[in-house]
């Protein structure tokens, strides 16, 4: 992947890219490098930097100054031509040239006339690399001629006639500005009826009697000479026919009045311009002004349109009551026919103005300075346009190229000069002249052939801070000839950056479009050309963006209540945000009801005008966020007006007896509102240091109206007073007048002075600076003094600005210093401060503790001892000793897991310490290190020790499996921490009867290598509690307990336990011995009697020839664990010895709540007992046994055993 390079807007046309492109990016418009000192020795042809305008009109009453400034290396010399010939300034004593400049000063104020120096001037700036020339500067003195004397006859008109009052000002230079006023210098009012034309004449569409006056005066203002000329006043009288007296009516005819227009209503006609058509020519870029003024009665209205087009919306303006159409910045596209239409109630008239837009020359591509290295190619382009098209001509060093010295590296092709294989002799200044009949353009562009090794102009070690996920731009402004190539590297040994995440701009800037945290680091810019190499390092830090944690929310509150807006932000810890609250995008009202703390804006006693949008803006030096919320104020629920209230604020505050350090304040109390004033609180504002912040000054009794206040120097005091009664405190009074006390020397020094090094070779002196109030005068500074405590050195002092830290470099490591910080200002010093002691920077300790030894206290506790290190080797404040200890692992275990080290730190100079929590029967290793404020020193040699045996932990698990009628099997896992060699296991158990009483305890010792044991000869259906623990030679460990129940007899085994209890799960239950219950004995007797009756009935039916050989079939399907009942005596069969100890199926365990898995017996009583449909045929034989039915739902058991069903009991006999 290659580093992306941003494309240039316009590629170069020939050869390698010349240096002028990057020079334009790093050099100002005048080609001055960003760092002039860096390029002081760079040879450069002249460049005109300042000159007078082409048409230079001067004030003939002042000295003539014709500017010509230029720069170059070496500095250029200057010469002038006047009217095309050399102007020898040495021959004219009135003409001087400013030193180091080409500016001419012609002293006509002492003698001489400005008209003598009219002419066309041109300046030439020349050095060894070429010559630059200025524009042709036409110098003309301004003129403001007087009006010619004339006699103006009074004008008499009938009402309604039109009128034009001519101005015809004298021709001046520049043209005068015309306006009409009366003899009181008040401008004459203008309207759609009366207005001034572009030529200065005053036009009346129709006259009215109120136009009668004798002082219509035209004024011409000549701005250049700041003079005003005036025409003779014109008298106008407007009369109506009704006003004519008999004499006038008899002696004058209608045509003898001024003008022949009728005073009756008439359609419009144009006063200007004349005729139906006219032509207007204007230059490109100027303001096109078209005018149409009409007369008529009633007054006509003017409209404007453009034929075959529309008027440009953003450039069209109407002036003079729409009588003038103006189009700014006209171009050739504005040419065409424009029509003005004058209309009144009697008709309309129109006039067409044909507009042609011509153009003086203007640049398409102006030539730019060209910097090349020897052997390179380059191009100068000079392209201009105009109407008519301008002619392009070239000059070199002010001489037309046709007659200039020939240069083999130069080839001219119209508006382009091409250079190939340039040499230092090719350096010159070229002038391009583009001209037509309307004007000319002249541009200087130099060709400078240089051979310079690369130089980087960006400051070294510049730090850039950027918010994450935003672009980062790292500058590398460079210079060199030939143009250097630029490469960027990250880190001190990184490779060149060639990844897509970077963009390299032509000016050397490295852009990271989306900077991330891992973009942080040092970047190196390297510039190379064939003459050498230069590099520069910059640093980039990526900061977390500022974001809201809590934003203000919409609120609706009642008038008079309080509302709070919360605004919390999370920001980068290195940036300090400022929170600004705004109301309706403006500042908060200057009202104490608005209070702002760190995260909240609180508005108390809300008023209707408080409604609006409140914005919280959080700003850091790198980013900002804002959030807004709307507050709506509603009417409150009516409440009774209070009888009592806080006092009204005091007023009429006055300062008297004004001294340097005291003043007397007097005031007039406000109304106490039916509750006596108990005290007055006086606050002050320091407008100089803490404007807008009011602080407590004093309190006086409620009966006083004056207070003598102590003042501090150099404080601009304002005071205000609040009154307080039992209801509360009044609002503050209006502020008093300000009183500025005189400055004095500080009367206190900074506090919290400390000296603490941050590096081994420095001492950082910090203090809490004085605030502005404490400064006592302007120019607050601090005198910082220090010297070694144990040396004979003199105090070293430095005066620093109003800061809070000073760093002393080059100090020895951890040496005590005496430090003083004294305040001073422009008036003097504060009292001599007391010295405090500090230390230069710490370094890591040099020596490890020696003679480390360990004594074992018991199996879990040991004590370590060591010898202290020499104090000088600590190289800092001794914070203590740190012990690292860990349990040694075998090589196989070390490979499987990381060794966990434990750390204990013993403060101060202790040389021993206890190591608790050790594991018995283990091998441990430890080492000791000394600790200071910088960190840890080297570790001592590892020391090993063994802990003796201890008692083991409890067995990891204990399970009761395979319960039978008289046995239980225990399985367990050894202790997780044997803490020695296990010698045996101890098992204790005891039965629990139905009343939860414990029976006799049985002890049993089991060999240590066993993990399974079977207990025999237990009571059936009995709960047992087990206690189990391991032993070492030291003693017994913690025990684990469990409970389990042996199984019940076969009748009870057949499904009386709840189905949700898994086999073999040992659990506690509340067991009731039902065998001793009276109801159970009675039930058993009833069941026995019922069984006997059924046996007799069955026997009789069998003797009569029953349908099925029941006995044989039932014997074939009988449960293998149950013996059939004897036929001869009718009693139940007993369990055999073999079956008493017959193990359960593999993996089965009988739970303590006596649930038996259904697959253990197909003849489960639950299938046929009470609550289940009977499964017998008409002769009582068991049908289910032959139907193959296996899946029966087990019944839920309870805490007492159920009596067996007589039907199921019958199944066991046959």
Curated annotation (Swiss-Prot):
Chain positions found as Phosphotyrosine: 1135
A GO CC term attached to the entry: axon initial segment
GO BP, one annotated term: central nervous system development
Major location category of this protein: membrane
Positions of modified residues (Phosphothreonine): 1131
Compartment list: Cell membrane; Cell projection, Axon; Secreted
Coiled coil location: none
Disulfide bonds: 68-123, 167-218, 292-340, 382-432, 476-525, 567-616
Segments of skewed composition (Basic and acidic residues): 1109-1129, 1151-1160
Keywords carried by this UniProt record: Cell adhesion, Cell membrane, Cell projection, Disulfide bond, Glycoprotein, Immunoglobulin domain, Membrane, Phosphoprotein, Repeat, Secreted, Signal, Transmembrane, Transmembrane helix
Region (Disordered): 1109-1214
Phosphoserine found at: 1136, 1161, 1164, 1181, 1200-1201, 1205
GO molecular function per UniProt: ankyrin binding; cell-cell adhesion mediator activity; protein binding involved in heterotypic cell-cell adhesion
Residue ranges constituting the Ig-like C2-type domain according to the UniProt record: 46-134, 141-235, 267-356, 361-448, 454-541, 545-626
Tissue specificity: Detected in cerebellum Purkinje cells. Detected on nodes of Ranvier and unmyelinated axons in sciatic nerve (at protein level).
Membrane-topology descriptor: Single-pass type I membrane protein
Family: Belongs to the immunoglobulin superfamily. L1/neurofascin/NgCAM family.
PANTHER family (alphabetical): CTX-RELATED TYPE I TRANSMEMBRANE PROTEIN, NEURAL CELL ADHESION MOLECULE L1-LIKE PROTEIN
Protein name, entry field: Neuronal cell adhesion molecule
